[in-house]
Regions:
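N-terminal secretory signal peptides that target proteins for export/translocation
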Residues: 1-3
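Bacterial N-terminal signal peptides
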Residues: 5-16
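Beta-propeller-forming repeat regions
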Residues: 20-245
Length: 245
């Protein structure tokens, strides 16, 4: 039976949340489009004001106990993203939600949410109208957990950064590496190109150079992100095709 859960204002839950083991996020989407920011990185004139979740509060039970929850941002924030991403970052078998959240004065950050609100996040970039483009998830440091890859300021600085979620002493995102010279988005495009592939057991990020003329691959080697030029790039669609080993 579907029961409607509470509508939650995010300003009340910006502190780190502890996710109950019995709860599972089964669906996530953005809602409440807003024109209060209008950065328009995807060519649109609106971003999102809320994160909508469907949460099973009795995961593993014979019958699901589904609740709809809305995590609503303060008026000074928007979600500046295409779609929320459900992924298990801490290896507990339950997914977290990974999103791009923007403070209108400080730019974007990569945020991780649970059923009741924010778990942790990277720092904001630090300047208005500065954005980051998620690249994907992979086990870059071979510890058995999925890490997060994104390109910070893909239209300007073009810096790939990789983070992993640590749960002790409290949840936080630890940076594993960064490298400049790779991007995955062009201003106005509705798609984020390329992503993470795993070939021969090794996670690597596929993207473009700053001129969109060369295909680039980034791997974590010896604790450092290493960038390689792997050939000419004539179309952004090549980056998506390259995700197939």
């Amino acid at each position: 039976m579907m029961r409607l859960g509470p509508i939650v204002a995010l300003g009340a839950v910006l502190a780190s949340a502890t996710v109950a083991q019995a709860e599972r996020i089964v669906e996530a989407s953005y809602g409440e489009p807003t024109s209060r920011y209008q950065h328009g990185v995807f060519g649109e004139t609106s971003e999102w004001g809320a994160l909508k979740l469907v949460v099973d509060r009795c995961a593993g039970c014979a019958s699901p106990d589904l609740h709809r929850i809305v995590l609503r941002l303060p008026e000074t924030h928007v979600f500046e993203d295409i779609v929320p991403r459900l992924v298990d970052l801490d290896g507990d078998g339950e997914p977290e939600v990974v999103v791009v959240e923007t403070d209108m004065a400080q730019g974007a950050r990569l945020s991780v949410y649970g059923p009741t609100g924010l778990i942790t996040a990277t720092p904001y970039i630090g300047q208005t109208r500065r954005w980051l483009a998620p690249a994907g998830f992979g086990d870059f440091n071979d510890d058995g957990l999925l890490d997060i890859a994104y390109v910070e300021t893909p239209h300007l600085g073009k810096v790939l950064r990789i983070f992993t979620l640590r749960t002790t002493p409290s949840p936080h995102l630890e940076e594993l590496g960064r490298v400049a010279g790779i991007t995955n988005h062009r201003i106005g495009d509705s798609n984020i190109w390329g992503g993470v592939r795993v070939c021969q057991g090794r996670a690597e990020v596929i993207g473009a150079d700053g001129n969109w003329s060369r295909m680039m691959v980034a791997r974590l080697q010896g604790g450092e992100l290493v960038l390689s030029d792997v050939g000419p790039l004539s179309s952004p669609a090549q980056l998506d095709a390259a995700l197939r080993c």
